[in-house]
Design a protein with these regions (language model features):
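A short, Lys/Arg-rich alpha-helix, primarily the initiator
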Residues: 1-27
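Residues within the alpha-helical elements of helix-turn-helix
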Residues: 24, 35, 63
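Short alpha-helical "recognition helix" segments of helix-turn-helix
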Residues: 28-33
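Recognition helix of helix-turn-helix/homeodomain-like DNA-binding domains
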Residues: 37-52
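Key DNA-contacting residues within the recognition helix of helix-turn-helix
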Residues: 44-45, 58, 72
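Short, basic-rich loop-to-helix N-cap that marks the start of a DNA-contacting helix
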Residues: 49-62
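Short C-terminal boundary/hinge segments that cap the last helix of small helical domains
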Residues: 65-82
């Protein structure tokens, strides 16, 4: 059985994790856009994306003080055991 690549696995969606974390912190896409020096439309686009570019994700992690890379690593480890 072929293992699905992260791009083929709809169960892991970084954009939805970002949206949920922003909501948990009571912050908005506009606030985050200001923190990472982009326009809000880029944040809304990230919400819809299963994956987010590493440079943007790094800035988002700093702004939210949340390690999304840890989420990616946990997903990778879970995939290894499946």
């Amino acid at each position: 059985m072929k293992t699905k690549t992260p791009q083929e696995n709809p169960e892991f969606h970084l954009g939805q994790l970002l949206k949920a974390e922003l909501a948990r912190q009571g912050r908005t896409a506009t606030w985050l856009a200001k923190q990472v020096h982009c326009i809000p439309e880029n944040i809304y686009k990230a919400y819809r994306s299963q994956w987010i570019s590493m440079p943007l994700l790094f800035e988002i992690c700093k702004a939210l003080d949340y390690d999304f890379f840890k989420e990616c690593s946990a997903y990778l480890e879970a995939e290894k055991t499946n």
